[in-house]
Amino acid sequence: MLKKNLIISISALLMFIGCNEEPKTQFKIDYKKYQLDNGLTVILHEDKSDPIVSVAIQYHVGSNRETPGRTGFAHLFEHMLFQESQHVGQDQFFKKIQNAGGTLNGGTNKDGTVYYEVVPKNALETVLWLESDRMGWLLSTVTQTAFENQQEVVQNEKRQRVDNRPYGHTNYMMIQNMYPKEHPYNWTTIGELEDLQNATLEDVRAFYEEWYGPNNATMVIAGDINKQETKQLVEKYFGEIKPGPNNPDPKPMPVELTETKKVYHEDIFARSPRLTMDFPTVDQSHFDAAALELLGQLLGDGKKAPLYKVIVEEKKLAPSLYSYSGTQEIAGTFNVTVTGFPTTNLGDVENAVHEAFKLFETDGFTNDDLDRLKSKYETSFYNSISSVLGKGFQLARYNEYYGSPDAIAVELQKVLDVNVSDVKRVYEKYIKDQNYVMTNFVPKGNLNLIAAGSVLFPIKEEKIIKNVDKITSEGDMNVAQIPSSFDRSVQPKDGPQPRLNLPKVWKHNYDKGIAIYGAKHDELPLVSFGIEIEGGMLLDDPNKIGVANLITDLMMEGTANKTPIELEEAIDALGSSINMYTTAQSINIEVNTLKRNFEPTLALVEEILFEPRWDAKEFDRIKRETIESIKRRSAVPSSIASNVFNKLNYGNHILSNSTTGTVASVESINIDDLKNYVSSNFSANLSTISIVGDISRSDAVNSFKNLVGRWEAKEVSFTDYTMPKPNSNAKAYFVDVPNAKQSEIRIGYLSLSRTHPDFYANTVMNMKLGGNFSGNVNMVLREEKGFTYGARTGFRGSKFPGTFTASSAVRSNTTEESVNIFKEIMTTYSRPIDQTDLEFTKNVTLKSNARRFETLGALRGMITDIARYELPFDYIKDNEDIVRNMTVESHNELVKKYIRPDEMIYLVVGDAATQLEGMKSLGFGDPILLDANGNIVK
C-alpha cells in the first residue's frame, strides 16, 4: 500500500503558509506523455501501490460545441456511448466492466465529456478494447430506437435533477439572461428537449463524427502498469482509429452586461425564497481566476465573511448562504446564493448583499485570512489526487484544457501566489458596482417576496397526464460496418486475478473501555481519524427528537476558550476539517488533516469535546435554521418518500424518526436539554476511535492518551424499544405532491440487522436484482422502457434490523406500470438464476476487492465497521468465502426467504390526481392516502 511514485517536494509545497515570500512549488506527478499518429494524446502514470488501473478519457466536447437549435447532443452521447458499439453488444459495456470487478461512469459539462473506469490491473486490456470500440466503432449502432431510448433517459434525468426539485430551474434562468443567444453558454448541458426531439439521425451522427475523434481527446492510464506493454496495447486498439476534423480549441468569450437583469419564478416545490446574483467574470485560464477563487471564499465562507455577518447574523434574513467563483473554458461568473426564511423579502436580501460588499470594502482582510484559505486549498488538493483515478482526472483535464499535465502545478502556484492586492483588484474590477443577473425563486403564491424590478421569466412546465403508450418512430439508417485490421468481436482474456492484500489493522485497548483501531496508509501526508460515540438519536427523549442533532451543530460553534469565529479560524489555519454529526445510533467526529498538523488538530478536537461553549445566541440561530431546514425538506418528493417509508416500516419505534426531529419537537428543545444529554451520555466506554494515514501505531496510541485520560466512563441507560413486526400482507400507500413531474417509488419491508448471519449473503443475492447498474430493475425500467434515470434495490442494516428497499423516480405517467414492473421482477426473481448470472454476481463482488481500500476514506470505513460490529480484522476473507460457496440453489433459497413482494409496503409520492387510481392494479386494495408526515388523510 506504499505509494512512492507520486513525486512531491513536500518542503517546498508546504513552506508557503505564513511566509511573506512564496516559494515556487515543486509539485509534480510523474508521467509519460506521447501522441499516436491519429492525434490521440496518451498519458501514462505508473503507481504500483494497489493492484488496480484507472483509464480516463477526456473528450474536448461539451455543450459549448453545440449550436442553437441543436443542443443537448454532447450530453446525449455521454449516454449513448454506454449502450452499444459495433463489437460490444447492447448494455454489455457496464456488464463487462463490472464482471471484471471494476467501476465506471461518465460525465458531461459545458466544456467537455469524460469517461472513466477503475479495474483490477489484469483487466486493463478489456478496458482498452471497450473504450477503443466506442471511440472508433460506434456509428454503426446509432439507430433511431437507441436514440429514442436515450432521449427518454435524458428527459428523466432532467425531471429528477431540474423539474421535480426546489430551485431546479435556477441555472437555466441565469444563463439565459447572462449570455446572448449565440453564446455557447446560453443553453444548459442537458439541452432543450425540443432540440433532441426534432433532431434527425443525420444530425446526431454528424455531431459525433465532428467531435469524438481521437485527435480531440486525452487518455490517461494510471496505476499498476508496465509502460512499455501498455503502449503496445494502446497502439493495437487505438492506433487504427481514423482522426476527426482538426477543430481549434474554443477561444475565451467573456460577456459584459449593459444592465442588471432581475427575473423571478414561482416554484411549486420551494418552501422558502431564494435569491442568486451572478456577475460576469473571466475564463479559467485567465490570470484573475485564482484571485476570484479566493474572493469567493472570503466573501461568503465562514462566520468572519461579510455576507454571513450581515445576512445571517445581523439582519437574520437567512439561515445559510454561499458565494463562489465559477470559471469555465470560455467564460465565468461569480455567484452569491442566499436561501431565506419563509417570509424573507428578497429585496431586503439584495440590499443586504450590497451592504456586505461595502463592509468588505471598509473592513478588508489580512494576509492571515488568505493563508488560512490556502491551507484549506492545500488539503483539498491532496484529497483530489488521493486515488489513481483522481490523478487521472487531473492529468487529463490539465492537458486538454491547459495544454500540458504540468499545468496542474502552474495553476496550484497561481493560488499560492495570490496576495491581498490581487483580491482587492478583482473585487473592484468584477464585483463592485457592476451589473449582474439576479434570480428570485419564491414559493407558489408568494409574489410579495420578490425584489422590486423583477420580471417573470417563463418556464415551460411539463403537463402531467395519465399513462400513455410510448411512440417509437421509424427511420433507422443503414450504415455499413466499420472495418478493422483484426477481429474486435473477441474480448481479450484477463490476466491472473491480482492477490488481495488486506491492510494491516491494529487495535489498542485503553482503560475506561475505549479502544482505538488503525491502519497505516502513507501514500500522502494526510491523517484521517474519527471518534464514534454510541447513542445518537437512540438516546433522545421520544418527545424531543432532535436533541442529539442540535448538539453536534452547537458543539462546533466555539469552545469555552474560543468564540465561534476563533475556532473556525484555528481549524482553517491548520488546513484541517473537523465535522461533527449525528446519526440514528451514534454521534460522530470526523477529521481530515495534514500529517504535520495532526497534533494541533487533535488538541482542537479535545477542546470541542470537553470544553463546550454552550453559546445561547448560537443555539437560538441553529435551532431556527434546523426548523427551516425541516420545512424545506418537507417539500422535496424524494425526502418525503424516504421519511414516510421509514415511518411505515418502523411504526412507533424511535428509528422511525428523522434525526433532525420535527418542527414541533425542535421548537420544544432548550439548551439545557443539550447539556443534560452530553453530561449523561457522552461516555468513554461507549466510544471508539479509528485512524488511518501517515502515522504509526505507537504515535497514534500515544497521541490519544490525553483525550482518553480526560474522558469519564459512565453508565448509560438505553431504552429497550420494541421492534415492530414486519408486514404479513402487502399494502399500497400514496402521498400527494400536486403537479409532480416524477413519482418517487419506495417498495420494501423491515428485514435484517447488519450482524445477522444472512445479511452479507443477502447483499450478494441482491446484486442481480438491483444491486448495480446491470441489475434487472434498472435494465428494464431505464434501459428497456426509458421510464427512469435509475432504479435499484438493496438491503440496509445496522445493529438494528434495516429495510429491504426497491426505489426509483419515474416519469409521472409511467407510475402504474413501473410499480407493477417492480412487483413482477421481484416475484419472478424467485425462479432460479442461471449459472452465468451467478458467476457474474461472484465476479462483481470478489474482483472489486482489489480496488476496495485505495483511499483513506475507504480504509477508515472498513475499520469503522470492524469496530462498530466487532468484526474480525480479516472479515473481508470471510465474506469472500460466502461468495465463493454460494450456489444457484443457496442463492434461490435466500430469494424465497427474503424477497417477498406480497408482504411489502408499496409507497408512491407523486401527483394523486393522475396517478393514485392506477395503484389499485397492484391488487392490494385501495391505496391509502397519506400526508407528507405519513399520517392518514381522512
Each predicted region: which residue ranges?
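M16 family metallopeptidases and their MPP-like homologs
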Residues: 45, 50-66, 72-76, 90-137, ...
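Proteolytic maturation boundary segments
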Residues: 18-42, 226-267, 409-532, 690, ...
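Bacterial N-terminal signal peptides
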Residues: 8-16
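Positively charged n-region of N-terminal signal peptides that target proteins for export
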Residues: 1-5
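Short, conserved secondary-structure transition motifs
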Residues: 154-161, 253-266, 374-384, 593-594, ...
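Non-catalytic, conformational "gating/processing" segments within enzyme and secreted inhibitor domains
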Residues: 144, 151, 205-237, 435, ...
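Hydrophobic, small-residue-rich alpha-helical packing segments that form membrane-like cores
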Residues: 144-146, 151, 157-158, 165-174, ...
